[in-house]
Regions:
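N-terminal loops that bind phosphate or other acidic moieties
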Residues: 1-400
């Protein structure tokens, strides 16, 4: 597959240059490493640093923002950032209250972030980390700490950022973030492979008409390869696997993320969510908020993932706190899309002025007599209005 790039060896550097240039009002690049730094940061709080390999955009660089991460340490395509990048990026945003690292649970990330923490500790900076392991297909429940981190990063970063902005101490930020992580479950399905820049072959192969449940973001083997299935069948299988792995029950509230893996359209994500919503309704589980988007991707991989994030009152408080970055926002202006108000909706009442000249005696008389709403419109009134409209259309005929 052809990619819109120049030299494959410069993809990350050029992507970083373009990204920082596009959003220079928010970000600055670290002068020495591939770190995205938020310009306007709150002082006197725990710093939140996220990171991982590039190629999953907008995760991780795209989740630096108000109420989210203070910085992101970015590696090469599908490769962990090196310890120095992690160290330098965190050092740039540390405010004296410590640093929390949030990243997906992968061997390279675990090793390099641990080393980055050691460098910071040597400087007298307090650190902690929360590894995201939401992928239910990657290891059984008894080995949950071996699971991979995938689209569940979105919810964990959201809660961690809010907890930091709330002014919690590092120990408390870790507790809240771990609760968010432990309440998050994801499974994905791949319908087409991804391809690395400059590499001739895709990172895995799928036969014509095949799909794979549980495929990882880097092409890691899934749990089941099967023939093509309709959206409702896919969504139901994925939903049931998440439910079997969680303690969700009737009366619980969840946030839902249907995440595209790179080349899947919003149309398809919406169709998948439609089925998930019906299944949740049938089980008596309330939807508090929903996102359908490509947040955690794998180049041009086809497919999607479903994430369920179980809320309690504490997590809901942090989820509702405002946040903003170019790719993700929550707060008063965005509200939530679910049933937080008991499923009640309010019809929007639009008050509009008449589009005709009220100085026109005939039309104005109709408006005055019917108080603008025309609740008791009779045949004569209707005839007069239609004649008036017809006359206006005829008068504008040269322009139509």
């Amino acid at each position: 597959m052809r990619k819109i790039i120049n030299n494959p060896e410069h993809v990350v550097d050029e992507m970083m240059e373009g990204y920082i240039s596009a959003y220079s009002r928010y970000y600055v690049k670290h002068p020495d490493v591939n770190g995205v730094i938020l310009k306007q940061r709150r002082k006197d709080k725990v710093a939140l640093v996220i990171g991982g390999g590039s190629g999953h955009e907008p995760m991780f660089s795209g989740f630096v923002g108000k109420g989210l991460a203070d910085a992101a340490a970015c590696g090469n395509i599908f490769a962990s950032p090196d310890p120095n990048t992690i160290y330098q990026t965190a050092k740039a945003v540390e405010q004296g209250k410590g640093v929390l690292f949030v990243y997906g649970c992968y061997a390279g990330d675990n090793l390099n972030f641990d080393m980055g923490e050691e460098f910071l500790n040597d400087d007298g900076i307090q650190t902690a980390h929360v590894r995201v392991w939401d992928d239910v297909a990657s290891a059984p429940q008894e080995r949950i700490e071996d699971r991979r981190g995938i689209a569940g990063d979105v919810f964990v970063v959201k809660i961690a950022g809010a907890a930091c902005d709330a002014g919690l101490e590092l120990e408390e930020v870790v507790r809240v973030t771990e609760k968010a992580r432990d309440n998050t479950r994801t499974i994905g399905v791949a319908t087409a492979p991804a391809q690395l820049p400059g590499v001739e072959q895709p990172i895995f192969t799928l036969g014509e008409g095949e799909i794979e449940y549980g495929m990882g973001l880097h092409g890691e083997r899934g749990v089941l390869r099967t023939t093509w299935e309709d959206a409702d069948v896919l969504a139901e299988k994925m939903y049931k696997q998440i439910l079997d792995d969680s303690d969700l029950k009737t009366g619980d509230e969840v946030c839902v993320l249907v995440n595209g893996l790179g080349s899947t359209t919003i149309t398809e994500l919406a169709i998948a969510f439609r089925k998930v919503k019906k299944l949740l309704d049938a089980d008596g589980i309330k939807v508090y908020d929903t996102d359908l988007n490509n947040y955690c991707t794998s180049q041009e991989m086809g497919g999607f993932s479903i994430t369920l994030f179980k809320l309690d009152e504490e997590l809901k408080k942090y989820y509702d706190m405002p946040c903003y970055c170019p790719y993700y926002a929550k707060g008063e202006l965005t509200g939530n899309t679910g049933e937080a108000a008991g499923g009640q909706t309010e019809d929007v009442q639009i008050k509009s002025e008449p589009e005709f000249d009220v100085n026109d005696v005939e039309a104005a008389e109709i408006v005055r007599s019917k108080a603008g709403i025309l609740e008791e419109l009779n045949a004569a009134d209707a005839r007069n209005m239609l004649l008036y409209i017809a006359d206006k259309i005829i008068a504008k005929k040269p322009y139509l």
